[in-house]
């Protein structure tokens, strides 16, 4: 077996607890558009999909998708503090970096929100590569962002 030299991490739900960051943005966007706001369990089950698929799964229509995405992002730009690092994530990443591992993150979120939440968590500079939603032709779980 070859030695492992590189580690890949998801951001939301692995390094950061972004539950409130995502759910509150979703609730806000749907409310602003006057649409029905599903319960938090339903919202959580759909997290991770592309924005168009995410909002379609919650509303059953593509009619307001672009507006919902814009409202969602605007909310997040003012509420980065809602994404918090999990306990010991900073210490663990520092330990791995000190051991010489190359490290990268892969997320479906935008570059702006993923970078800022990683900066706020104090882990941004520990990564050699940060792959965001707009960096790849296909999103997770497709392996395309890795190549």
Show where each model-derived region lies.
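N-terminal helical cap/lid subdomain that shapes the substrate entry/recognition surface
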Residues: 2-90, 95, 99, 115
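A short linear-motif detector with a strong N-terminal bias
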Residues: 23, 109-110
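Short loop/edge segments at beta-strand edges and connector loops
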Residues: 87, 107, 132
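Structural motif
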Residues: 46, 106-108
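Short active-site oxyanion
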Residues: 100-105
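Substrate-recognition "cap/lid" segment bordering the active-site pocket of phosphatases
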Residues: 82, 110-147
């Amino acid at each position: 077996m070859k030695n492992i030299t590189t580690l890949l991490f998801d951001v939301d739900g692995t390094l950061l607890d972004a539950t409130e960051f995502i759910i509150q943005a979703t609730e806000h966007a749907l409310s602003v558009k006057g649409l029905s706001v599903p319960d938090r369990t339903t919202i959580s089950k759909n997290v991770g999909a592309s924005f168009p698929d995410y909002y379609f799964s919650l509303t059953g229509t593509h009619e307001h998708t672009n507006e919902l995405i814009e409202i969602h992002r605007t909310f997040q730009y003012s509420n980065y503090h809602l994404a918090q690092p999990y306990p010991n994530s900073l210490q663990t990443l520092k330990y791995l970096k000190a051991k010489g591992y190359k490290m990268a993150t892969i997320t479906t979120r935008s570059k702006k929100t993923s970078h800022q939440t990683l900066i706020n968590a104090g882990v941004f500079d520990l990564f050699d590569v940060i792959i965001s939603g707009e960096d790849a032709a296909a999103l997770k779980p497709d392996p395309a962002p890795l190549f």
